[in-house]
């Protein structure tokens, strides 16, 4: 499948990479359908592109690429809402805020994106009881 993004141009994706966010994503509550696309030239980063708004896309990354100790606990409500049966079906991503200075690139560890790859349902959750930050430096000195 092909989608044309205002920012990223022509994006090719497969149906299996389409993710539905029933509650939308923070800042994009009215947008529900996205494609998760590998950015091969910028690995390990990915693009979470809205399929409903050609100007709405987020750069995301697995937090484990940079923070091996990152840990969250999904509650039963989250697990039920996303119909998660196996932990191996869960993909965890965090949004990235880019900067021309790589030392200023941040990621949002406070509100990770959870995707159940067995049914392509996703949700961004807010970790109320954690010390994680909304703007956590990706590269710590």
From Swiss-Prot:
Gene Ontology CC: one annotated term: cytoplasm
Cellular localisation: Cytoplasm
InterPro entries linked to this entry: Flagellar_assembly_factor_FliW (IPR003775), Flagellar_assmbl_FliW_dom_sf (IPR024046)
Organism: Clostridium botulinum (strain Eklund 17B / Type B)
HAMAP family xrefs: FliW
A Pfam family: FliW
Protein family (similarity comment): Belongs to the FliW family.
Major localisation: cytoplasm
Name of protein: Flagellar assembly factor FliW
Assembly and oligomerization: Interacts with translational regulator CsrA and flagellin(s).
Main function: Acts as an anti-CsrA protein, binds CsrA and prevents it from repressing translation of its target genes, one of which is flagellin. Binds to flagellin and participates in the assembly of the flagellum.
Assigned keywords, A-Z: Bacterial flagellum biogenesis, Chaperone, Cytoplasm, Translation regulation
GO biological process, one term: regulation of translation
NCBIfam families associated with the record: PRK13285.1-1
């Amino acid at each position: 499948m092909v989608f044309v993004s205002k920012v990223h141009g022509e994006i090719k994706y497969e149906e299996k990479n389409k993710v539905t966010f029933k509650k939308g994503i923070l800042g994009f509550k009215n947008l529900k359908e996205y494609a998760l696309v590998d950015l091969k030239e910028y690995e390990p980063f990915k693009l979470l592109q809205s399929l409903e708004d050609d100007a709405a896309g987020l750069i995301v990354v697995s937090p484990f690429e940079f923070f091996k100790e990152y840990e969250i606990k999904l509650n039963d409500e989250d697990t039920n809402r996303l119909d998660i049966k196996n932990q191996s079906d869960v993909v965890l991503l965090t949004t990235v805020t880019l900067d021309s200075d790589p030392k200023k690139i941040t990621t949002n560890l406070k509100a990770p994106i959870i995707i159940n790859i067995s049914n392509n349902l996703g949700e961004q959750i807010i970790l109320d009881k954690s010390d994680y930050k909304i703007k956590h430096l990706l590269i710590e000195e």
